[in-house]
């Protein structure tokens, strides 16, 4: 059934949603009449509220209370928010989202410090994102077969122990401890020189290859000077794959549980426990759900792809249009995970060469500041995409 609302009813829906987001209190006709200039009586507003309730956009938690948005009401609000079709019916006197100067500052820092410690920086981004939104922030680092090797370095750290450091082209650093090879007798005194020679050789041979490709490399045909190391190199690569590739697959940087617990919707221990269990045990399931949606196209009504920018919004470096990052928004019962039916999930992916590298996610109550949250998720994903290009 097609939803048909009058312009005033749509304005009243918007005002109700925004008032409830701001106060967490049921909204009545008197509050709306005092806060917004609809140009009609409270009785007319009350009738429109009743109509919005009849079509499932609002409901009354108690008989004598005002109205609060349903999941469907939030969905209509968000769809209107993200399209220009209803811009004429939007109450512009409603509260507008505040800018995020702190987030912008950290994103600028991301571009400057990317090569230093990406994991630490992503954790700080998650913490700031959680603080600004009042939600839980989840960020997965670059991972998967599209992450390629950029540099390999072998370092002697103790007698009989060598550390192999692998730097990827997404600026992550992985390490593994291995036993040194059976050095030729004339090379034992020049251990550092020999390790540097092997480091240069490995960097030359492995640069641009993915971790998944390491398992299939053959070291049977090597230059004369490295032939004696063939078996050791095979073992070294096996250690790198086991130690460096596998742990990153489920890694999630998270922050914001304290912020979430301040929300009135999570005042009950049962609701907090469900989310804590998800973060501790099921974060990979949530991230997999998001990644699968983007990979398969997902439900069109859940996704948002902003329109192409005008010529003034071109990327200054590449000269190409900087289309905003698509987002996926699950509201309440839309969530595939039943434990999140009282939550909203806003997520996006960041990419390199059109291949998804990781996800940026906010998890909070359905009573969420959608404008700010969507803008923040898009900003982080877009900056990561540009920084890792």
From Swiss-Prot:
Q: Does the keyword Ribonucleoprotein apply?
A: no
Q: Where are the transmembrane segments?
A: none
Q: Does the keyword Transcription apply?
A: yes
Q: Which UniProt keywords apply?
A: Repressor, Stress response, Transcription, Transcription regulation
InterPro entries for this protein: DeoR_HTH, GAF-like_dom_sf, HrcA, HrcA_C, WH-like_DNA-bd_sf, WH_DNA-bd_sf, WHTH_transcript_rep_HrcA_IDD
Any one GO MF term held by the record is: DNA-binding transcription factor activity
Q: Name one GO biological process term.
A: negative regulation of DNA-templated transcription
Family assignment from sequence similarity: Belongs to the HrcA family.
Q: What does this protein do?
A: Negative regulator of class I heat shock genes (grpE-dnaK-dnaJ and groELS operons). Prevents heat-shock induction of these operons.
The cross-references to HAMAP family, in alphabetical order and at most eight, read:
HrcA (MF_00081)
Q: What is this protein called?
A: Heat-inducible transcription repressor HrcA
Source species? Synechococcus sp. (strain JA-2-3B'a(2-13)) (Cyanobacteria bacterium Yellowstone B-Prime)
């Amino acid at each position: 059934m097609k939803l048909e609302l009058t312009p005033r009813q749509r304005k009243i829906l918007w005002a109700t949603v925004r008032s409830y987001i701001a106060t967490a209190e049921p909204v009545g006709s008197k509050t709306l009449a005092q806060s917004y200039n609809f140009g009609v009586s409270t009785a007319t507003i009350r009738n429109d509220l009743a109509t919005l309730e009849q079509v499932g956009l609002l409901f009354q938690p108690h008989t004598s209370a005002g109205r609060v948005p349903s999941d469907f009401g939030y969905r209509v609000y968000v769809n209107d928010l993200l399209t220009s079709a209803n811009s004429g019916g939007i109450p512009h006197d409603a509260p507008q989202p505040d800018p995020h100067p702190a987030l912008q500052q950290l994103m600028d820092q991301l571009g400057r410090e990317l090569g230093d410690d990406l994991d630490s920086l992503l954790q700080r981004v998650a913490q700031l994102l959680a603080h600004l939104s009042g939600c839980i922030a989840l960020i997965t680092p670059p991972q998967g077969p599209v992450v390629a090797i950029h540099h390999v370095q072998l370092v002697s750290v103790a007698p009989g122990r060598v550390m192999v450091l692998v730097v990827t082209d997404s600026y992550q650093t992985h390490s593994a401890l291995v036993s040194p090879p059976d050095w030729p007798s004339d090379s034992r005194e020049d251990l550092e020189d020999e390790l540097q020679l092997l480091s240069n050789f490995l960097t030359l041979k492995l640069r641009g290859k993915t971790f998944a490709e390491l398992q299939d490399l053959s070291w049977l045909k090597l230059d004369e000077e490295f032939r004696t190391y063939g078996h050791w190199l095979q073992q070294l690569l096996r250690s790198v794959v086991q130690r460096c590739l596998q742990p990153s697959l489920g890694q999630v940087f998270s922050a914001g549980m304290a912020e979430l617990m301040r929300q009135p919707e999570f005042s009950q221990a049962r609701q907090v426990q469900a989310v804590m269990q998800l973060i501790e045990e099921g974060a990979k399931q949530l991230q997999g759900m998001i990644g699968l949606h983007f990979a398969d196209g997902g439900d069109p009504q859940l996704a948002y792809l902003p329109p192409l920018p005008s010529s003034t919004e071109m990327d200054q470096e590449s000269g190409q249009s900087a289309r905003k990052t698509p987002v996926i928004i699950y509201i309440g019962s839309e969530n595939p995970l039943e434990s999140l039916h009282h939550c909203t999930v806003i997520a996006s992916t960041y990419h390199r060469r059109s291949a998804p590298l990781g996800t940026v996610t906010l998890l909070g109550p359905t009573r969420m500041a959608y404008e700010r949250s969507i803008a923040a998720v898009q900003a982080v994903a877009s900056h990561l995409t540009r920084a890792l290009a």
